[in-house]
């Protein structure tokens, strides 16, 4: 049988995260420093945020490589954001920015957190910085486009950004939802319905996607269809 570390790493690289954890969880991170990092990545992919955060905390404490620590902190901030623990996410992101970190991931995540906590103009400014730093970054473009649509401003630019993001990752359900939502905000609900239905089919349990779909169907006079399907 292969060495547990090598087998766990192989399974991780193949995208078999549950199987990878079978091997990685039994490895002492003190003996194999990278074990905690890959454990965290597996937990994150499997939606086990709390376990991922604990592993990332261990990486940050024991790792000596600055880039690995920075990567762990960025993943930690992202997980805190997805869990809607915005004060903790903001503290982590602000700390990296104050240290001089210039990263599209940090800027876009920070912008989203600011917007989510009621500071829309500041959030848009940081997302613009992210897109300027990396004009081809799909996540930054999608986040900025979605937030512009939510704010009801610069809708043509929002449409352009979300279309570019989706062109880079055509099957990404979040990008499908964002583009559908932009079309809704522009009053083009028939087009919005097409993209939102694709997003819901890809992630039927996502409450935000379903809420957007319901609102569009209601606008089209078709809300009873969604109620029958729920």
Description of each model-found segment:
Residues 2-26, 38, 75-84:
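Alpha-helical segment of the N-proximal tetratricopeptide repeat
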Residues 9, 41, 78, 112, ...:
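Residue-level recognition of tetratricopeptide repeat
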Residues 15-19, 47-55, 83-95, 116-129, ...:
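Structural signature of tandem alpha-helical TPR/SEL1-like repeats
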Residues 25-29, 61-64, 94-98, 129-132, ...:
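Conserved structural position within tetratricopeptide repeats
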Residues 29, 61-62, 184, 189-218, ...:
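TPR/TPR-like (Sel1-like) alpha-helical repeat modules
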Residues 30-32, 64-67, 101, 135, ...:
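Short coil turns that delineate tetratricopeptide repeat
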Residues 35-37, 69-72, 106, 140, ...:
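TPR alpha-solenoid repeat register
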């Amino acid at each position: 049988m292969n060495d547990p570390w090598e087998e766990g790493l192989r399974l991780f690289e193949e995208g078999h995260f549950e199987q990878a954890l079978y091997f990685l969880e039994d490895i002492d991170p003190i003996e194999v420093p990278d074990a905690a990092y890959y454990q965290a990545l597996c937990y994150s992919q499997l939606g086990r945020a709390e376990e991922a955060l604990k592993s990332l905390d261990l990486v940050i404490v024991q790792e000596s490589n600055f880039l690995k620590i920075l990567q762990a902190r960025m993943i930690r901030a992202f997980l805190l954001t997805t869990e809607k623990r915005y004060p903790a996410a903001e503290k982590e992101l602000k700390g990296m920015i104050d240290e001089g970190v210039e990263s599209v991931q940090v800027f876009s995540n920070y912008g989203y957190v600011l917007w989510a906590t009621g500071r829309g103009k500041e959030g848009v400014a940081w997302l613009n910085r992210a897109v300027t730093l990396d004009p081809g970054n799909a996540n930054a473009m999608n986040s900025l486009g979605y937030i512009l649509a939510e704010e009801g401003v610069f809708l043509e630019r929002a449409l352009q950004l979300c279309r570019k993001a989706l062109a880079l990752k055509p099957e990404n359900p979040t990008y499908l939802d964002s583009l559908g939502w932009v079309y809704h905000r522009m009053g083009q609900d028939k087009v919005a319905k097409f993209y939102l239905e694709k997003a819901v089919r890809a992630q039927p349990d996502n409450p935000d996607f379903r809420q957007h779909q319901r609102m569009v169907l209601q606008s089209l006079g078709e809300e009873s269809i969604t109620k029958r399907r729920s």
